[in-house]
């Protein structure tokens, strides 16, 4: 989807201050309040803005560890395996990938015991032929928002 300058400015303003009022947003972008309302609604209807959420600090709520797991999955079982994995509340991302793995899974866990449980309960389900678990030691950058422009 092509975004014009006004759309880009609105998105950047919302990334900086997601709780900004519509009036503040319009002022920041330099457009009329009605225009801001119409543009925001349009961005939501087109799926550019998928929703509104809270950005939590995982460690502050007890998720001490993050793991990245590469999976090799039997041919013909990819979708079923991924759906089952995605249903686990500790899992926050499941990707189809190219390269050495068929899928990459990212999960947050509280401790080593939970890593053991996750490995035995989730990463050993039927259809997974091999898993490669990597524990994140330090996070340099993590963001759920990536603007589609410079």
What are these regions (language model features)?
Residues 1-150:
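A compositional/biophysical signature of low hydrophobicity enriched in polar/charged and small residues
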């Amino acid at each position: 989807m092509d975004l014009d300058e006004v759309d880009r400015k609105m998105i950047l303003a919302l990334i900086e201050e997601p709780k900004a009022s519509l009036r503040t947003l319009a002022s920041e972008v330099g457009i009329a309040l009605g225009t801001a309302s119409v543009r925001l609604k349009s961005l939501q209807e087109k799926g550019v803005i998928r929703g509104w959420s809270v950005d939590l600090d995982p460690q502050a709520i007890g998720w001490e560890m993050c793991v990245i797991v590469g999976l090799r999955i039997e041919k013909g079982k990819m979708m079923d395996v991924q759906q089952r994995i995605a249903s686990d509340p500790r899992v926050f991302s499941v990707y189809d990938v190219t390269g050495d793995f068929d899928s990459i899974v990212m999960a947050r866990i509280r401790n080593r015991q939970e890593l053991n449980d996750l490995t035995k309960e989730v990463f050993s389900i039927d259809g997974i032929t091999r898993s490669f678990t990597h524990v994140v030691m330090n996070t340099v950058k993590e963001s759920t928002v990536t603007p589609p422009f410079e």
